[in-house]
A protein has these predicted regions:
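N-terminal leader/capping segments at the start of a protein or of a new domain
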Residues: 1-61
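Glyoxalase I/VOC metalloenzyme domain signal
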Residues: 3, 14-15, 22-26, 50-54, ...
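Double-stranded beta-helix
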Residues: 8, 12-13, 17-22, 27-31, ...
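Conserved short histidine dyad/triad with adjacent acidic residue
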Residues: 26, 76-126, 160-162
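Ligand-binding loop in jelly-roll beta-barrel domains
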Residues: 69-74, 138, 147-151, 160-184
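A short beta-strand-loop-beta hairpin characteristic of the jelly-roll/cupin
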Residues: 117-126, 131-152
């Protein structure tokens, strides 16, 4: 990553006072050779609602997936490098491998060469409600029939739609995501 991420986790001591139990870089980081330069930093994960506020010092020691557990959440920061040098070379197998490594090959929409009218080889759809905050740089939010240029300070509420993130600039883009398990059968409005 271009800048280090510091994660501070609080908890309680034996007397119930608030304390810092962890202060340092994230311990769950994933990169994929099929998507060069993309770095996923998992910061925290929950697997129940309401979320447990006690428990393990590091909730990210389990395998990293794209989607949160049922009734869970994922909090992460993803850095997207400029993609102009490699995006046109992404094969269907590359896209499947990149998403398969996150346990989410089922989420891929188009499989690499964007068949079926998909606009980006990494178009995907999950049954999650995602809050995205662009921290630095800029990135296009690619949807089925439109695109939105997102810049630092912009927020997206992504509601289980087919989408991709495309950095067409010459600088990295860093986005914070909170993914919440959702119910995509509740209707589309």
């Amino acid at each position: 990553m271009s800048e280090k991420i510091r994660r501070v986790v609080t908890g309680h001591d034996a007397q119930g006072r608030s304390i810092v139990i962890s202060d340092g870089p994230p311990t769950s980081i994933k990169q994929s050779p099929q998507r060069p330069g993309v770095v996923i930093n998992n910061l925290w994960m929950t697997d129940t609602m309401p979320a447990q506020t006690s428990g393990p010092e590091d909730a990210t020691v389990k395998p990293m997936g794209l989607e949160p557990a049922a009734s869970g959440t994922n909090f992460r920061i993803v850095e997207f490098p400029p993609e102009t040098d490699y995006i046109g070379k992404v094969s269907a197998a590359d896209a499947q491998k990149a998403f398969g490594d996150l346990g989410a090959s089922h989420a891929l929409q188009g499989g690499g060469q964007a068949p079926g009218g998909k606009r980006h080889p990494f178009m995907h759809k999950t049954k999650t409600l995602d809050y995205a905050l662009v921290l630095s740089g800029e990135c296009y939010l690619v949807l089925d029939d439109s695109e939105v240029l997102m810049k630092a300070g912009d927020v997206c509420v992504q509601r289980a739609t087919s989408h991709a993130w495309s950095n067409r600039s010459d600088k990295p883009c860093k986005i914070a995501f909170i993914l919440i398990d959702g119910d995509a059968t509740a209707g589309h409005h």
